[in-house]
């Protein structure tokens, strides 16, 4: 018997697994819609709320920051008080946030709503933990886990198109109401389709450690956002504000480390932080996300729209050529990578994903040298398979299967934080390097190339750090 308790009536029959998968899929949909469905509504929100583009952009920043911070501790809290209970609570807060945002009359109320919507941040790792408790066979789990995580990445692009249709027919509020309805449906399905489980040992939550870790990560994420100019209206230079926030984050992390060494039941035992299963995975996730995210969500779309050095496509056409095939390729290949992980192991498939992603990024450089719509489509589809369909799924899966028996929630939470931190760092680093070289992304072909090559170098480093990640069998993982 392992370190998780499951209901006495728990069974692995097909009907219960199908009900569980449907419930978890809709819960993940509810999070994904909050993350990406709003993109086409931003300009309309600015007009209808009589505010500025920077204020609306800040509401997006606040949502993603809140999502990252909730992900740090809610999976561990779920270990202690019940995963089903916490998932329903997260979805309830998300639904309330959607309603507040939908009825918002000014940007201040909208920000409150978006913060509450950020409670959905750890939905994916928590759903993967719930699935792992139910499905004890590692090979079967790998296949089902891949379906959940590929769906999470796969509707990006499609949901944005749906968001655009809703905005044009019902205004931005209709988008929030659809998000709220989806969250309500998820609450209903999770209530009836999942069973409660906790860790075997359920001491009190280490709230001192939680506060210090949340402030530390929040300060670091805010420092990244400050470098991007998200808080420019505070009157301080971006570099100075970022430095202050980074120092605050460092101080709080040192405090977190000291607290965790002294309390009887730490949120994250220090000996786990020192193990390769923790820092090996977190470093690889951070490097990978930093290397890939801005390429696929910034540089490649910008190249498609660039009339001088690229193809001069419209925004809608660029989405159809780059973002949508990238997402759909990940969706369709995800189950295949799950099958491969079940046969060869998560770590080996991760390395294949990273190696082929490196090849895809090299193709992206060719796309700059000889721009064509077919080459951009090929690059987007290829990296959609190798990153969204393989690498991203394996990184999420490793966060679950490498988690220790007595603390299965800490690693998925920290891993989610690295995904979010990497997304922010990606736009800073990949756009800063061309500036150092006296060019810019969009300013010349060499600007695009230097940004992409920077990402390429980071992913190459991630490939080598992936060899630091131990095999799950070496960690004696057993979540039964």
Swiss-Prot record:
Disruption phenotype: Mutant shows slower uptake of uridine. The double mutant uriP-nupA is impaired in uridine transport.
GO cellular component: plasma membrane
Gene3D superfamilies: MFS general substrate transporter like domains
Bilayer disposition of the protein: Multi-pass membrane protein
PROSITE patterns with a match to the protein in the record: MFS
Transmembrane segments: 14-34, 55-75, 93-113, 115-135, 147-167, 174-194, 207-227, 239-259, 280-300, 320-340, 358-378, 382-402, 417-437, 449-469
Compartment list: Cell membrane
Pfam families in UniProt: MFS_1
Cross-referenced InterPro entries: MFS, MFS_dom, MFS_trans_sf
UniProt-recorded Gene Ontology molecular function terms: transmembrane transporter activity
Keywords: Cell membrane, Membrane, Transmembrane, Transmembrane helix, Transport
Physiological role: Responsible for the uptake of uridine and deoxyuridine. Not involved in purine nucleoside uptake.
Family classification: Belongs to the major facilitator superfamily. EmrB family.
Entry protein name: Uridine/deoxyuridine transporter
